[in-house]
A protein has these predicted regions:
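N-terminal leader segment of winged-helix/HTH proteins
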Residues: 1-39
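N-terminal helix-turn-helix DNA-binding core of bacterial DNA-binding proteins
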Residues: 26, 30-73, 84
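C-terminal regulatory/oligomerization modules of transcriptional regulators
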Residues: 1-10, 131-157
Length: 157
């Protein structure tokens, strides 16, 4: 009896960088989601909230582009933030079809806490890094983000 063994070639990744970045992002976001639950912020909403606090008057399209998410995701998150009293939505003065998003006093109050926590996460991520290593990693990730941003805009259309 002859048994044939087929060789199965599995394609491998050229780099694990996206898996590492994804794991890092999910871990930090999971920690933050747990910590912000008491603030009545649901999964990932703190990301939208911080960008609105940092860019008062931003519209949904600009916010979606900034965060690299689709407009439906942004709309859903913003509706929840409005309902929770974190964001005000006002009709754009120049384009009556558009709306501008502004932080409320409530969101400005928690913004400081969110930034403190984000800085703490950054400190943990950079534990045992030299200042030069921190700068190099940051510059390289910014460069990678820019490369992906161009592709994201192409695919988004």
């Amino acid at each position: 009896m002859v048994v044939s063994v087929e060789v199965c070639l599995i394609k491998t990744l050229d780099s694990n960088i996206l898996r590492e970045v994804g794991t890092l992002s999910r871990a930090v976001n999971s920690i933050n989601d747990i910590k912000y639950k008491e603030l009545k912020l649901q999964k990932g909403q703190f990301t939208f909230l911080t960008r609105i606090c940092e860019n008062p008057g931003i519209n949904l399209v600009e916010l979606s582009n900034m965060l690299k998410v689709d407009k439906a995701t942004t709309t859903k998150a913003i509706q929840k933030l409005i309902k929770a009293g974190y964001v005000d939505k006002k009709q754009d003065k120049f384009d009556k079809r558009g709306y501008n998003l502004t932080p409320t006093d409530k969101s400005l109050g928690v913004y400081e806490l969110i930034i403190e926590e984000e800085n703490r996460s950054i400190e943990i991520c950079f534990d045992n890094f030299t200042d030069e290593e921190k700068q190099v990693v940051t510059k390289l990730l910014e460069k990678m983000s820019k490369n992906v941003e161009n592709e994201w805009f192409k695919v988004k259309r």
